[in-house]
Amino acid sequence: MEKGGNIQLEIPDFSNSVLSHLNQLRMQGRLCDIVVNVQGQAFRAHKVVLAASSPYFRDHMSLNEMSTVSISVIKNPTVFEQLLSFCYTGRICLQLADIISYLTAASFLQMQHIIDKCTQILEGIHFKINVAEVEAELSQTRTKHQERPPESHRVTPNLNRSLSPRHNTPKGNRRGQVSAVLDIRELSPPEESTSPQIIEPSSDVESREPILRINRAGQWYVETGVADRGGRSDDEVRVLGAVHIKTENLEEWLGPENQPSGEDGSSAEEVTAMVIDTTGHGSVGQENYTLGSSGAKVARPTSSEVDRFSPSGSVVPLTERHRARSESPGRMDEPKQPSSQVEESAMMGVSGYVEYLREQEVSERWFRYNPRLTCIYCAKSFNQKGSLDRHMRLHMGITPFVCRMCGKKYTRKDQLEYHIRKHTGNKPFHCHVCGKSFPFQAILNQHFRKNHPGCIPLEGPHSISPETTVTSRGQAEEESPSQEETVAPGEAVQGSVSTTGPD
């Protein structure tokens, strides 16, 4: 063997064994260099493991000098204990009832693997929790319906649930008191829909399927009966493996006298139909149509793609649409109707139907719901993860960026940088016309617009300062003062204090 040769030695799973030994040391309380306090409970750990597992700890600006960290955002110490164990072992055992707590804690610690898994779990169980109860009630209703004579049209008293506001249910605590009514049926969309669900003709069904009527407060009852073939409406057809949700007008619940009349005196009501898949996929297909005074249906599709639901259990697109309509009363809520027979026939086809839906989506104010970048508190969706992280810090009151000179705390890194420039006097942006200096590009642009109209700032680096400016032009104009500060010629630019933190 040559003396200059290299021998490569590779031990499988050595890194896993190192983490396992570190976990044993943590359990024994040996060689731990940091203590994390969560709701009065202390957890000893190693800084290197926390920094390698969580971007929050890795980007913490004063982690090197700290021996104790207190986290007030995480309310359940057991949740943090499981997450801490995951940092060492890569395994976690969580309770299904605490899935939201794990998602909140993982979002704060920026542990993306836990966030992804919790999101997948929520998407899978969103409908299974309530659909199991609905299916049990419907099965009982079908059994009792088969034992009764066909003349019975109404539900028995033991199946009726009180719809009075005094009847509070767990579902009512979760949903807002909205004066709209959901009618859940085993129905299919109208004939104009291109839904991929399997449709059976309603003419072969003699008895009407049981109807579970639910209002937005979560109060519900089951109604069953028999409908003759001639009296069945056009929209009463069955969809296999799906439950049809229809938002109805309050006329039949509150009475015609409580129904506000429209400006044109018409009695048309808008019906929003959503088909919920009960097979556990958690997908919802949505379509709109209008019922006129004569009962004729006019197709009004608004979305052909699958709408997703938020972890909190609220229908995000529906609430966002109502909010957008209330904020912009001048916007046309009615979608475009086909202007010719050619356009109408194209809309009925699959390709034309998709193009029609895309045109309608462009006109909508609300943006598509993204379950991975959605705030778990207010269901607001974002396009970038950094924007969601900054938004979550506002909800939680997190101020991870601390000034070392005066101790002031800030939510965003750019706010701390601007504050530090007040201490250091660093003004890296210079006006080539009058020689004045400014701490931010936005203030320099404002100076040019106000004092040197027609001139533009010179491109290129303005200072040798290592500090970088991360604020956008719009943010700096809102958050930085507009006063102009002068610097004497030849004044040295002071070095800036380094700040690090989560993006």
UniProtKB/Swiss-Prot annotation:
PROSITE patterns: BTB, ZINC_FINGER_C2H2_1, ZINC_FINGER_C2H2_2. GO terms for biological process: negative regulation of transcription by RNA polymerase II; regulation of cytokine production; regulation of immune system process. A zinc finger (C2H2-type) spans 373-395, 401-423, 429-452. Residues 144-154, 319-336 have a biased composition (Basic and acidic residues). GO terms for molecular function: DNA-binding transcription factor activity, RNA polymerase II-specific; DNA-binding transcription repressor activity, RNA polymerase II-specific; RNA polymerase II cis-regulatory region sequence-specific DNA binding; sequence-specific double-stranded DNA binding; zinc ion binding. It is found in: Nucleus. Residues 140-206, 280-344, 457-503 are annotated as: Disordered. CDD domains: BTB_POZ_ZBTB37 (cd18222). InterPro entries: BTB/POZ_dom (IPR000210), SKP1/BTB/POZ_sf (IPR011333), Znf_C2H2_sf (IPR036236), Znf_C2H2_type (IPR013087), ZnFinger_BTB_dom_contain (IPR050457). One of its GO terms (cellular component) is nucleoplasm. The keyword Zinc applies. Residues 155-167, 465-474 have a biased composition (Polar residues). Its main location: nucleus. The keyword Glycoprotein does not apply. SMART domains: BTB, ZnF_C2H2. SUPFAM superfamilies: beta-beta-alpha zinc fingers (SSF57667), POZ domain (SSF54695). Keywords: DNA-binding, Metal-binding, Nucleus, Repeat, Transcription, Transcription regulation, Zinc, Zinc-finger. Residues 32-96 form the BTB domain. May be involved in transcriptional regulation. This is Zinc finger and BTB domain-containing protein 37.
